Structure formats: C-alpha cells, structure tokens
Amino acid sequence: MRSIRRLRDGLLEQEISQLQKAGYHVLQQDIQGGKLWVLTVLAPEQKTGTGPLTLSITLPDSYPLLPPRVTTSDLTMGHHQHPFAEDLCLIERSTENWIPEWHLAGLLDNQLKRAVAAGQAAPGEGLDEFEQGEPFSAYYTYSESAGFLIDSARMDLSVGTSGDLQASIAYGAAGRLLIILDQMRTGRQVAYEAPDGLHTAFEPYRPSALSGRWIILDKPPATNDPKDIWRLAREADSASTWPNNFPQNPGAPALEVRAVGFPEEHGRDVTGLGWFLVLKEHGTIQQAKKGRGKGSPTVLKTPETHKLVRAFRAGHSDLSYRTPETHGLEGKSVAVIGCGAIGSVLIEHLARAGVGRFHLLDQDILEPGNLARHAGALDSVCLDKSAAMAHRVRQINPYAQASPMKFHVGLPALVDGQSETEILEALFTSVDLVVDATVEVGVQQYTSLLAWDTSTPWVSLEGTPGIGGGTVVKITPDADGCFGCFQRHQRAGSIPEATAVHSALVQPVGCAAPTFTGAGFDLSVIALQAARVIVGALMRTTPSGYPEDGYDAHILNLRNEDGQPIPPVWQGFRVTRHPECGSHDV
C-alpha cells in the first residue's frame, strides 16, 4: 500500500499541467506554511456558462483522497455557495461523491457549470439537484461556548412579528452556557411555550431567569457579524426598553438577548423558520488594586461583546426525527428489574429510542468500580442503581418519566403492608412490558410467572460466565411456550446454550459479594439485542413501527469452544410448549 506522502509526490505539478491542458489558466500557486497547496485559477466563460471566474482552490493534506475546497468572490448565488466563506458546492457533502480520478480539471469540467446554473436558478426550475434543503442558519459562525434550546414544533410564527421572551440559563457540561427558551409573547398573547420536560433535564444546573426580545425578519441577515445582526434586529423591533437581567456586581456581566428568526429551507422545496440568539454582554465590573496610600481603587469595565448562539432543536419531535420506526414509543411504559451492568445499558438505549415511562427496580448502590460495565457516570456513584439510571434517562430524554425504586426481590418482608407479589402484580398490570435483567434464575422464574399471570409481555437478558455469550428470551401472553418451556428445551438440547468461559469470580475490595468477570463491550452486545427485541414487541401494533424478528429466544456466542473471541453470532428460536412443562396445566 502506498503512503499518503508518496501518493502526493509530484501531484501539484500534475494538477497544474492537467488544468492548463483542459483550458484553465493557473494565475498563481502558493504553498501555505510549506504544506497547504493553494491555486488561483481563471475559469473561462465556456467552462462556467456565466463569464470568466477567478477561483481559489485549496488542496488539503488528504487530497486526492478527499476533495478540494473551491471558492470565488466573483459570484453571489442564493444556492450552492456559502454566503460568507464563498465556497462553491460542486458535489454533495458526503465524500463518497468525490471521485479522486477526476483531479481538479475533471471536477471543474464535470461540476462547475452545473453548480453555477443551479445556484443562479430560481426555486423550482427543475434542475437536477440532490434532495436536500440548504438552511441558511447553518452558514453563520457561532459561539462555541453557548447553545440556545428550542422546540421546533412550537415555532409556528409569522414574519414581522416580535415580542418579549423569557428564558432560563444554566452552565452545563464543560462550562457551556445553555439558554433554554421558556416563553415568547406578542403583547399579552403567548406565542411559544416550552415543553415541560425540557426544564427537568437542567434542574441540577440551577438555571436562572433571563428576559429579552424576539423578532422574525423577512430574510436571513446578510452579515456574519453579531454586532451588525444585533443592530439590524434592534432597528426592526418596535420595543425600546430592556430589562436589566443581572446586577453589575464585580465579575457578573449584564446580559441582553435577542432571538432572531427568518425564513429558510428545511428540505427540498420545504420552508420553515431558522433561528439563532444574539447574546450581548455589557462587560464585567473589575476593581483594580489600590495603591498604598492612594485612596479608593479604580473601577474598570471590560468591553461589551456580541455573540451568535446557535439554536439547537430539542423538542420531543426533534429528538425522534432520526428514528421514524420508533415513533409511538413515547406512549409506552416498561418495568426493568435489575439496573446493573446489563440492565443499565439496556435502559440507556430504550431511553434513546424514546420509551416514555420507566419503572426501575434494584437493590444495589452504584460504586465507582461498576463503571467499567455500567452505563452510569461518576456523578451518579453512591446513588441507588435505580436512581442513577433514572437520572441517566432524564439526561438522555427529558420527556421520559423514570421512577426509581429500591427493591429486593425475594426479601422476606412486607413493604407498607404489601407482599412483593402484590407490589409486582400491581406494577406489571400498569406497564406495557416487563424486563428481568437480574441474571438470577430464581428471580427470572418468579417474574416470568407473574408476567404470565398478569398477561404482560416479559423479556429476560443475561450473559454467561466470562461473557462468552448471552441469552435474550421474550415471552408474550399469546406465546405458545413459557419461560419454563424454554428452560426445558435448553436442558433437552433443542435450544442450545450460549458459550460460557468458566473463570473464577472476583470480589472487589469493599464489595459484599463476588462478581463475574468480563468486558462491558461484550455485555453490551446482549443488551442491544434485548433493546431490539423489546422495541419490536412494544411496536407490534404500530403501523410502520420497528418490526419484530419472529423469534422468542435469542442465543449469542462471543467465544468459540477454545475460549477465543469470535464475531458475534446470534441464533433465533421459537419457544414451543414443552410436554413436561406444568405451567400450562389447567
């Protein structure tokens, strides 16, 4: 295999020669910093279809495996050109559309005239273009230290409208400033109300209130300068009074915010509103040190700044837009018994899929050592595992409800005068599906019978010793067999057992009981398959929902008979009624 450096030997000279032979004029060549190739090329009218164009072509280190950057200041097009950086869109964004054999001359010959024609055409002229929109909001340069959270589905507003806004600000991970849009008003009428769940996720960050203004312009601002955009929005807005959001205390900036909306493409021939926030910081009050014997210190003020803050769409429909087959999960509820290593990974992915309500049961506490396999994080250690995963669910999907419960299945005691059977039966009848992630055969037998009695779909998942393999079993009320049938089929050999790697248990220091060994990434394979099975079962009656695979039992092998790792191998089986199973006796 040739190295990238050998691949580029003599390439610049070859590119220049091919451009000249194809009828382009190379006006200048430069090597920035001795490494980055930049060519200034004149493309004649017959190559552009519009007149001569001076092109600046930058070849990255990864060229010719990745495409060049081509810009021109001779054109201003509404499409297929970056409005500020002036890049020409000659090919679709994915690198699979770049053909290295084209070289520069071939790229320009094949794409330049087409891109110019498409960029200068009126909307709907039927040119052969990729089916995507060009949202203008994607072209601005935003602050990397802040984000503006909105719900797309609630932004049905008209051009020219304006009003007051209320927001909450919080400092999230890595000190990032998060501004959550709470409400927008036009006079006394509410024009936008944030969804309830969005605040829940940020309550641990203790958000503060923030007031400001909003306006919808008739077109995107044609400048990338935040200060100029602030001025444009202020001139278009009828309001002249502003709240003082923060006192001018030492170290605390006074903030003003304007949310700016404008029409833009959201898809091919689909128009919606683009948004961003302009954040104005009036500067912080700082006190210079007082010189000895010189009276009061001098009060200094840092300069005011303006920032563009990108709008991040965080409504319920925004979170599920990329997964259409899971639409409807927001109305489903699951009970998960066991929030340990395998259960936690499953819970995380069910939350990402959009399950609307979780009842989480576990008896244990999350320890730092658990994090090698557990889906929790260091900020959740010392919590009950059920509480840690309820917190994780809300971090992932603020619209999901998660109820943790410290619960020990098999504990010989009453809870508020109720037996565990009464508690679990009431829980099972209130949910759409029960998951047993305890990896305890006695508990599996118990919960499967309770699910059978309450006609509740039931799924169990577990890894074998050493995580050489794993098992996922689904039993629904209309199934032919039950979990007892599955166990008997395995003992009879009609359903195989997953590979096990028999190694000694380990007892970490301070832990009350030994635990199995094995890597979290192996365990996750089982949890992910269980998520597929569960989502399929929950979406069974939903048109175009995530489909079931048609199996009741799923057996995984991750190791061969010698204990060597192999690519994951799943086998699926139907669990038929076993003649020796007494659970079906009337």
Tell where the protein language model's regions lie, with residue ranges:
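Start-of-domain signal
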Residues: 1-35
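Domain-level detector for trafficking modules
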Residues: 81-139
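Glycine-rich adenosine-cofactor-binding loop
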Residues: 325-365
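Glycine-rich phosphate/adenylate-binding loop
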Residues: 137-296, 300-301, 420-586
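A structured beta-alpha segment of the ubiquitous adenosine-cofactor-binding alpha/beta core
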Residues: 390-432, 438-441
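Compact alpha/beta protein-protein interaction domains typified by the UBC
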Residues: 25-95, 100-106
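Glycine-rich phosphate-binding loop and adjoining beta1-alpha1-beta2 segment
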Residues: 363-401
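A short, basic/flexible loop-to-alpha-helix module at the beginning of a structural domain
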Residues: 307-334, 422-425
